[in-house]
């Protein structure tokens, strides 16, 4: 089955701080992304807000607890809750992270990188296929930021990500900030990372901020998108074309209007990158 990219435009994450504004007016963005786990409980204000928002603009679900790379069995309870939420909300798509965050039945509430080995690749692909079978739809997997690497890795991260998407017949949620953060932390070329990815598999982009700790960059989602990430996003657009793009801001969350400004800037950067590309192609 081929992966079908759906273009939604430029959106923002749905955060509790902005619930009142979302209830009062139609969201001033093209679409919103909701953290799946925050809306799995039946009833309550969060779900009521999400149901209202989905009547106004498209919604996608983004999970943080699937732990697709863990050696623990997939949580059937979690998949059941996600299936129920999917049936209720009918999101444009569902995504999670290409990582692991649980072991021995305990969740660390963190997103740890995988060893990039053939064994890990086969393991992850089997689990993605199972999740897609349960959900009845393709999944998008996001590249995570990382600060350590496994000596056992047999291939670079970008090759692993591309091969996961090919073998599992799933999509890629390309987090441009995570590419930049990991590139700085591990010393690889972020532009070479982009060049190795299959364009047809990329279904969504994340943009976010990070903190410079001197010796390393920390993916905080607590600042505006920095210049270097905007530059990498422009290259992403030139290489892959228009892709649904979301602004992530999870810490020190500003007013909704500030997120909307960042989303509009993403639209401007995208338009400029495409215009420059077209201009360069003219005789």
Curated annotation (Swiss-Prot):
Pfam families noted in UniProt: MbnB_TglH_ChrH
Signal peptide residue numbers: none
Entries under Gene3D superfamilies matching the protein: Divalent-metal-dependent TIM barrel enzymes
Domain of life: Bacteria
Family: Belongs to the UPF0276 family.
Name of protein: UPF0276 protein Anae109_1558
Source lineage: Bacteria, Pseudomonadati, Myxococcota, Myxococcia, Myxococcales
